[in-house]
Every structure is written in C-alpha cells, then in structure tokens.
Regions:
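Bacterial N-terminal signal peptides that target proteins for export
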Residues: 1-9
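N-terminal signal peptide c-region/cleavage motif recognized by signal peptidases
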Residues: 15-17
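Active-site-proximal loop/helix of nucleotide/amide-processing enzymes and allied scaffolds
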Residues: 21-111, 120-156, 201-264
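A short, surface-exposed beta-strand/turn
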Residues: 95-113, 172-190
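Hydrophobic, aromatic-enriched interface-forming segments
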Residues: 141-182
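Charge-rich, low-complexity terminal tails
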Residues: 174-177, 182, 189-194, 249, ...
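Short coil/turn segments at the loop-to-beta-strand junctions that recur within blades
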Residues: 196-199
Length: 264
C-alpha cells in the first residue's frame, strides 16, 4: 500500500536569504546522547506517519470536503495519537477543526468526530498549522508530493519536517528532505537544516532465494545521522538495518528499532 501524501499547499518561489542555515559540518562525531535524540525524533516521525496515514483513511470513509479541510496536523496526547483536519481561519487567528481522528487500542485504529460548525483551536494545532504555512512559503515550489510533520522540539520550539511522499508501491524515497526549527507560535523560522540534498528512489531487489540484508547510503551535507534516516528504516518494508557513511569517514548502523550505533 502506498503511504499517505499530504501537502495540499500552494508553495511559493524560493525565498530564504535571511534564515540561519544548519549546513556546517560538525567537527566531532555525534555523542551517544545526540544519537539517542536522533533516534527519538525519528521514532516520533514514524509514529506520526502511521497515525496520519490511518487517520486519513478513517476520514476519507466519510467523504470529506477536501477544500474545506486542506490541512492535517497530528499530536501525541496521553500516549495516543490525535489527528485533526481543517484550515486556518480567514483572519489567521485560529485553526478551524472539521474532523478529529482519535487513535484506539491499535496503531491503525481511529475513530472520527465531525464538527459542524468547525471547532476553534488557538493552541498546538493553530501554531503547528501556522508553522507549516510559514515554512512551506520558504521551501518553495516542489516538483513532487511531500508530507509535512510537526513535532515539539527539545527546547520548547517546533520542528517542521518536509519528507518526500511515497508515489510507487515498494519504493521508499530517501533524501531531498528538510527540517525547520520554528518559534512556538509558528510565525518565525529560527533555522533550517537540509538533511539530504538529492532523492534516492529505487526498489530494493534481490535474487530468487535471497533476502535483503540492509541498505546503505552516504551523507555529503552533514556528519550526522539524520532524523529522516531513522524514519526511513522504521517505515521501509521489509524492515532491515541501514548503514550510513558520513563525510568525515565515520560509519553508523541504524537498527530496525531505530537505535544508532557507531561502527567506525
């Protein structure tokens, strides 16, 4: 099954000259604590993706008005995921929720509540939707479908990710992704990290009787393992490890649980 693809925004031309870019290669390898933080963010991205995927399926069963609810934002509340679908108000002072999908006992189990009239939100969902809008304007015009993700950052801000969406069965795109750090109110970009530059899209193939042992790719922009590398491992089928080589000649393994070890 092809996973969700949700970025129904009109993206504008490139415009990012005043934004702090996180392009500088780190001079020392990431510490175990930094690798653990990357694992945690990657795992949250993977959970977010599963929640948004199945919540979207649940809402689609109601034949929603997509024009009235072009945006979706997910949040983990009390150990369960909640995904809302709606739009910013014309005054841009609140988020109007038309559908709320709540996770049940299983990760893929979602129940949906429809709001008519829409419910107002001036908290997380409002700020997250503003953050998506703010970063999408900076990101610019895209030539392919992308998915957006918003996570709380470790220092009280918001992370906004744009990852390429899956368009072909069995092909899991890696690369061409970016992470923004945005102020908590969603209005200002603090920094932008280009995690990978190019997109690799190929279907893993093995000879009859063989099994895929793992994947491998190298980094040229940063000397770190990226959050989206962990996401890639956790969402790819079959579930196999990934070896990541960095420009400073270090080698890391991302295991199938998302944990990262430095091998060289």
């Amino acid at each position: 099954m092809i996973r969700r693809m949700m970025l129904p925004l009109v993206l504008l031309a490139w415009c990012c000259p005043l934004i702090a870019q996180e392009y500088k290669k780190e001079s020392t390898p990431p510490s175990p604590a930094q690798l653990a933080a990357t694992t945690a963010r990657g795992r949250m991205l993977a959970e977010y993706d599963v929640a948004a995927w199945h919540a979207t399926d649940a809402v689609e069963a109601l034949k929603p008005d997509h024009a009235a609810a072009p945006l979706s934002v997910a949040r983990k509340v009390g150990g369960k995921w909640e995904v809302v679908f709606g739009r910013l108000s014309p005054e841009r002072d609140k988020f109007l929720i038309l559908y709320r999908a709540s996770q049940g006992a299983a990760p893929e189990d979602f129940s949906v509540k429809k709001f008519d009239p829409p419910a107002d939100d001036r908290g997380f969902y409002f700020h997250a939707s503003k953050a998506i809008e703010t970063t999408a304007k900076d990101l610019g015009k895209l030539a392919r479908p992308y998915n957006s993700y918003v996570l709380p950052s470790e220092n009280g801000q918001l992370y906004v990710y744009f990852l390429p969406g899956q368009t072909t069965e069995g092909v899991y795109p890696l690369g061409g992704d970016v992470r923004y750090t945005v102020t908590l109110d969603g209005s200002t970009i603090a920094s932008k990290r280009q995690m990978h530059k190019t997109i690799v899209e190929k279907k893993d193939s093995v000879q009859p009787g063989q099994q895929l042992a793992g994947g491998y790719h190298t980094h040229v922009l940063n000397n770190d393992v990226e959050d989206s590398d962990v996401f890639h491992v956790l969402t790819r089928i079959p579930l196999v490890p990934e070896i990541v080589g960095t420009a400073d000649k270090h080698v890391y393994e991302i295991r199938t649980d998302g944990s990262i070890t430095r091998e060289k």
